[in-house]
């Protein structure tokens, strides 16, 4: 099961007692801030959680799986996420139970 933005907003509503519209706007604003930072080439560091980075990938050879034809995969920039040590530890502890 995946955690959705709607579920995050619902949790804010229940935990903080703010109205649902404000909770939804807060979640949207949070993700928009991350999106804008990455679009402008910035790294996003969330203390205790992890880092979102941009990585440039070079062009490389590929193959069309239907035809077997060799095709180039173009160079592109991708978003990567590296979990922080606290997050890694908590996930490991949760899985150990």
UniProtKB/Swiss-Prot annotation:
Q: Which NCBIfam families match?
A: himA (TIGR00987), PRK00285.1 (NF001401)
Q: Which family does it belong to?
A: Belongs to the bacterial histone-like protein family.
What are the BP-aspect GO terms?
Answer: DNA recombination; positive regulation of metabolic process; regulation of DNA-templated transcription; regulation of translation
SUPFAM superfamilies attached to this UniProt entry: IHF-like DNA-binding proteins (SSF47729)
Q: Does the keyword Transcription apply?
A: yes
Q: What is this protein called?
A: Integration host factor subunit alpha
Q: Name one GO molecular function term.
A: structural constituent of chromatin
Q: What does this protein do?
A: This protein is one of the two subunits of integration host factor, a specific DNA-binding protein that functions in genetic recombination as well as in transcriptional and translational control.
Supply the InterPro entries for this chain. Hist_DNA-bd (IPR000119), Histone-like_DNA-bd_CS (IPR020816), IHF-like_DNA-bd_dom_sf (IPR010992), IHF_alpha (IPR005684)
Region Disordered: start-end pairs: 49-71
Q: Which organism is it from?
A: Shewanella woodyi (strain ATCC 51908 / MS32)
User: By its UniProt entry, which Pfam families does this protein fall under?
Assistant: Bac_DNA_binding (PF00216)
Q: Does the keyword Transcription apply?
A: yes
Which Gene3D superfamilies does UniProt cross-reference here? IHF-like DNA-binding proteins (4.10.520.10)
Q: Which GO terms describe its cellular component?
A: cytosol
| Assigned keywords, A-Z | DNA recombination, DNA-binding, Transcription, Transcription regulation, Translation regulation
Under the subunit heading, UniProt states: Heterodimer of an alpha and a beta chain.
Signal peptide feature range? none
